[in-house]
Regions:
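Glycine-rich, flexible loop/turn motifs
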Residues: 29, 33, 101, 127, ...
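N-terminal pre-ligand scaffold of iron-sulfur
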Residues: 2-108, 154-155
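Short Pro/Gly-enriched beta-strand edge/turn motifs at strand-loop
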Residues: 54-66, 134-138, 288-292
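Rieske [2Fe-2S] iron-sulfur-binding domain
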Residues: 64-181, 185
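Short linear motifs in intrinsically disordered
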Residues: 60-67, 144-145, 283-287, 321-322
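C-terminal catalytic domain of Rieske-type non-heme iron oxygenases
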Residues: 3-5, 156, 161-390
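N-terminal short leaders/motifs
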Residues: 12-41, 103-117, 151-152, 237-272
Length: 390
């Protein structure tokens, strides 16, 4: 979806790196990844072990479970997980596995419940994971419910977004670090957008027949925008990008809104501003990829969030949410579909070319090609990705 550029002061200039043109940070000689990284089951298994089992993985936003008993299920590295808010308001993550004989506890993708009960033998767990009911187990000598709480998964929040980490925090294996430490380089960077307070107006799930890395690479450049996104290019020039994060796990910057007031079908703002912005901020949209499965697009009137869930070397589920100021939902001039329809169109254009790339890369004729200087961010993303597989 992005990148291109020219220099301009940033609202975060006093605390963050300067924004630079995409071409200024390009490392000459960079090429796309070899074929095996997109088609090999062995590489995919490595990714699931070294990345998705050992890093902080985005699974949702706290607004999805606003009340006690609200829950959703998700999958990380092949593991089914339950994310639930307890009666005290705390959010927990548990493996979706009964401590009795291993049955899957919850089949729904989301819901509301006063407790978690196994459908097999009715073992029942409190929302904080404690076993509170186990029929006839008092007949078992030495049985203590306190020994059979649900297995918890590391869970933490950043800016209202919920992350889990399957690594063993107690042993520090896999280079485990806390979520606060992981996101320390971004401290305060997105505070103007009030991310923790936003609410989702819509989620669309996309099933894309392409490797998850192709999604990241596509998001990170606008070299393709003129040909692939005519509607977007009319509003936001494909060569208008500047980036302040150009190496490491967090990459991105902004692009300009040259026509209209927002990236919507009408070109008009579709909701109340989500933060306190200066006049020039209403002409900028910020796009950041946060390794390994989060794409964060920050608009003046909404935030678009992509959550990636790799399924196989050639298939990725993408969950896209549009988040708005909660006060906007009360107003008659709230038009969320103006933004949703626009980006649903752009998303589908992107997924199509990603699927074409996957098909071509699978050919015996494929070999890594040279990146353009306008693709400095995908090249940087590749470098960071390879670091985790070594």
């Amino acid at each position: 979806m992005r990148r291109g550029a020219s220099r301009m002061p940033s609202a975060q200039a006093d605390v963050a790196p300067a924004f630079r043109k995409t071409t200024e940070t390009f490392m000459a000689g960079a090429k796309s990844l070899p074929q095996r990284y997109f088609v090999s089951p062995e590489v995919f298994a490595q990714e699931q072990k070294k990345i998705f089992s050992e890093q902080w993985i985005l699974v949702g936003h706290q607004s999805q479970i606003g009340k006690a008993g609200d829950y959703f299920t998700t999958e990380v590295a092949g593991e089914s997980l339950i994310v639930v808010r307890d009666k005290r308001g705390a959010i927990h993550g548990f493996y979706n596995v009964c401590r009795h004989r291993g049955s899957r506890l919850i089949e729904n993708t989301k819901g509301q419940s006063a407790a978690i009960q196994c459908p097999y033998h009715a073992w029942t767990y409190a929302l904080d994971g404690r076993l509170i009911g186990a029929p006839h187990m008092d007949e078992v000598s030495g049985f203590d419910k306190a020994d059979y709480s649900l297995h918890a998964v590391n869970l933490a929040l950043w800016e209202g977004f919920i992350f889990v980490n399957l690594a063993d925090a107690s042993t520090q294996r896999g280079g485990y670090i806390s979520l606060d430490k992981w996101f320390a380089p971004l401290a305060g960077k997105f505070s103007r957008w009030n991310l923790s307070m936003l609410r989702s107006a819509k989620r669309i799930e996309y099933d894309v027949r392409a490797n998850w890395k192709l999604i990241f690479e596509n998001y990170s450049e606008c070299y393709h925008c003129l040909g692939v996104h005519p509607e977007l290019s009319k509003i936001s020039p494909s060569d208008s990008a500047e980036n302040d994060l150009t190496e490491g796990p967090f990459l991105g910057g902004f692009m300009r809104i040259a026509k209209g007031k927002s990236l919507t079908m009408s070109g008009n703002a579709c909701a109340l501003p989500i933060g306190s912005f200066e006049a020039h901020d209403f002409h900028l949209v910020f796009y950041y990829s946060l390794f390994p499965n989060m794409l964060l697009s920050l608009h003046p009137d909404y935030v678009m969030l992509h959550q990636l869930r790799p399924q196989s070397p050639g298939r990725t589920l993408i969950f896209c949410d549009w988040l708005f100021n909660p006060e906007a939902f009360k107003r008659s001039d709230f038009e969320p579909h103006d933004a949703i329809e626009f980006w649903d169109l752009v998303n589908k254009q992107d997924w199509h070319v990603c699927e074409l790339s996957q098909q071509g890369i699978a050919s015996r004729a494929y070999e890594p090609g040279p990146y353009s200087p306008r693709e400095s961010i995908p090249a940087a993303w590749d470098r960071e990705y390879l670091r985790y597989l070594q």
